[in-house]
Amino acid sequence: MDITVNSQSNTVAPKQAECKKMRYSIRKVATVGATSALVGTLAFLGATQVKADQVTETAPAVATATATPETSTASLTVASETATSVATSEAVESSVAHSEVATKPVTETQPSNTTPSVVEEKASSTVVTSSSDATTPSATVAAVSAPAHTSEAAVEAPTSTASSEAADTHTEVDLKVSENSAANANLSKLNGRIKSIVEENMTSDQIVALTEEEIKALNKVDFSDDAIKGTGTSLTYRNLKDIVASFLKQDSKLAVPYFKADTIINMPAFNTVDAQTMKKEEIDVWDSWPVQDAKSGVVSNWNGYQLVISMAGAPNKNSNHIYLLYRKYGDNDFTHWKNAGPIFGYNALEDDQQWSGSATVNSDGSIQLYYTKNDTSGGKLNWQQLASATLNLAVENDEVVIKSVENDHILFGGDNYHYQSYPKFMSTFDDDHNHDGNPDRTDNYCLRDPHIIEDNGSRYLIFESNTGDENYQGEKQIYKWSNYGGDDAFNLKSFLNIVNNKHLYNLASWANGSIGILKLDDNEKNPSVAELYTPLVTSHMVTDEVERPSVVKMGGKYYLFTASRINKSTDAEGTVAAREAVGDDVVMLGFVSDSLRGKYRPLNGSGVVLTASVPADWRTSTYSYYAVPVEGSSDTLLVTSYMTNRGGIAGAENKSTWAPSFLIKMNADDTTEVLPKMTNQGDWIWDKSSESLVHVGDQNSAKLPNEDFNVDYYAVSGYGLKPHTYPTVDGSTGVSEAHGVLTVTVKDGKDKKADKPETPVSPTEGNHSVDDKTNKPGTSKPADNNQPSADKEDKPTNPTNPDSPARTPFPYYGDHSNDNNSSNDHHVAVPVKPSTGDSVGDRRPVAQAAEIATPVPKTIVATGPTVPTNTVKEESVTETEAPKPVKSEEKVQSHGVDKANEVTKSDESSKGNNTKVAAKLATTPKTPSDSEGSNSNILSILATIFAAIASLALLGYGLVTGKIHLPKK
């Protein structure tokens, strides 16, 4: 039964029109006192029934109980009795599941310090009732809209004296039914298999919190067979997370060995005349490859010499051209390498670049070169094409010389079905995949790095590429369940994370990296494409870049390797974690198959074979890993690389150079391990004389005295180029506002860049769009400190490029390029790790796999019913727990943030809005606990005292003024 009390009724005697003087009798005064006493009594009783958790500045009295399936919300609220009521808001405890705030009802069985979550409720004029038995307390309350000046209140009184146990049971059942109804309402909107997946892997609260947009996205999931046409082997999102987890462990079986920094020297053979600048100076050398036997892959013995072709160029000059190096076969002395000069001659053009490739010996002794021709003329965004040329060499006076270059021609530029072409790439470059009204311009075009291999009498090229129409990029890739690669729980959480984050959604929709394969015809010296095939490996939704692929045939198996960077992937959290743990994020990936075009299996489960060990700006930082078979071995490979990032990253005097090589072993179970075997710098052949201990180091000796753990990623990974369009970062929290991932900030300390400002870095700083021509590592462009050598500028008599019209340089350059536009540096501090001794294999794990690859929580069996609240849906579901910030004083915001605090802040910032009231109505009478009873008892006692004082005051006033006359006997 509802009891409504009018505070003005029976308190003022009716005016008598015929009386000139108002008189009060003792009977009427008594009535006033009785009424006041009744008000105080009701206030006392109400204090045991109604407890205000939060009261805002409102005049109208509202008591609501709402259950709205459309908003997936069931909440109980009650307002203060009048505008003059005062109550103290209690602390709010919130439990977040998926991304909603869950609220539990308070019953007698719950401890007094348990309080519900608070949500904002709009005033409603709809009356929502929940009928109950006559033997149980009524749960019916009305939602009333009233003007701000109204002082009426609707308060429910107890209607039964049933036991509290029965009330608890009834309440829990009602709330559980309400909760299940809301969850079932959302489940009913899902179709087929995705409905079962959601039901099995999400809690009721999470299901209730699903938005209409999420439900719509879930219904678009494509469960097509994993063996999708045009896919090849998929590098999945699960693989990516596992790669990062392995990276963080710094497992000695996978981590690149430490090299002793003070033993590393610049390559003497590259103190030479630069093909483009025409100045003699020490120049950088990076991607390199030997002339190999196309059948076995071993380094060819060409007339007693080993030959290597390298990309090289003057620092900070955007000089990207290839040179021929040679040394006596079997010689292990790094200083004995000699430079035959640029293959395509001097006076080279900045816009006509040559990038990575491979080479083999033809039957007539000539060298067949396969390389990447890159055109940046007229503002082109790195138009890469596969090319080939024949090198005619000779030995003259113990020197290898380039006599001529012939048959230089384009082999392949993309067919648009198997492999994306540059025109097709440009046709969608301005598309808006994340639907924000602006062109994305984050796509990355790759068609480069051809690697020659001969199998069953035919020559094939393996190359880096992007997929074509056969299995093209686009939003559809986000909805392909097979691209996620994990169990349903992992896939579901990852899917919701991506669809709720427009930036990840953007990158994932464009990512369509692939490792392609084509067959050449039988013309060795002037080949053309005979046949195209579906890619061997694809990385839809994961990355656009899988660089420098190569296939090694060994032990009856085919091993496929590629180099990559985590920061070029869609795992922003993984990039941050890797950079914070190590200071770099480069890896070598590997796959194995029983045939050249067979199904490739990822090595070590995820595909990771090598992980970086030192910060990217150290002298001993390595990249561009290239595996060469060891002659006579069926399970061992020699890994080569270049060392020191270009453009003076480790100091202007430290040029990019060839690193010492080391061995890795392929195990029968498709696992790999780094062996404690190292060579001198620049060794491409492993034999009995190859092993050297000169460069063996540990973590302490792997850096130069002036090197520390502050990494300038803008210079190292950005090379002066613009990053992908990522959300802005809150400098006070270090958190990306779009997806709440932790950014790594500067650590206080002295270093060679200590004079530069501390600036938070985006978790994906260094992820670059093709708009910025980012395809391979480059550098930022400081002032050029490299002066021409005073030595005589001897110019070898090598062929020069054909005449070409002058071209206006384009301001953006690719990763392959050596341009270094000046920029503001961003330093990221990497925690100093303790020395692990001088053993290459002795490493301490930096982080656990679970920290980077967290599965979706399984369905939780609730110990009590919960009432989902109507709260703002979080923007995304974070896949990983963000790493701790370097600065302890910085606040970190995670996806588990208490949304109740946000509501409270919102209330504080919107005072004066008298329509928002949030409180909770207990459903059974109970004695107030110590925490809540004191306030309610005080209020009721004060109300009673006030009523008594008011009665006495009126009586005294009437007697003194003569307005009240005591009756005479």
UniProtKB/Swiss-Prot annotation:
Question: Which UniProt key words apply to this protein?
Answer: Calcium, Carbohydrate metabolism, Cell membrane, Glycosyltransferase, Membrane, Metal-binding, Signal, Transferase, Transmembrane, Transmembrane helix
UniProt entry tagged with the keyword Transcription: no
Q: How is its activity regulated?
A: Ca(2+) may play an important structural role and promote stability of levansucrase.
Q: Which GO terms describe its biological process?
A: carbohydrate utilization
Give residue spans, biased composition: Basic and acidic residues: 747-758, 872-910
Chain segments annotated as transmembrane: 938-958
Query: What Pfam families does the database record attribute to this sequence?
Result: Glyco_hydro_68 (PF02435), YSIRK_signal (PF04650)
**What EC number(s) would the UniProt record show?**
2.4.1.10
As its record notes, the protein acts as a catalyst of:
[6)-beta-D-fructofuranosyl-(2->](n) alpha-D-glucopyranoside + sucrose = [6)-beta-D-fructofuranosyl-(2->](n+1) alpha-D-glucopyranoside + D-glucose
Bias class Low complexity marks the residues at 89-103, 124-166
Q: Where is this region: Disordered?
A: 89-169, 746-843, 860-934
* Highest taxon in the source lineage: Bacteria
In this chain, composition skew of type Polar residues spans: 106-116, 776-789, 924-934
* Site-annotated residues for Transition state stabilizer: D449
For whether the record's keyword set contains Signal, the answer is yes
Molecular function GO labels: levansucrase activity; metal ion binding
Which amino acid positions bind Ca(2+), per UniProt?
Answer: D443, Q473, N512, D544
Q: Which family does it belong to?
A: Belongs to the glycosyl hydrolase 68 family.
Q: What is this protein called?
A: Levansucrase
Upper taxonomic lineage: Bacteria, Bacillati, Bacillota, Bacilli, Lactobacillales
Name the gene behind this protein.
ftf
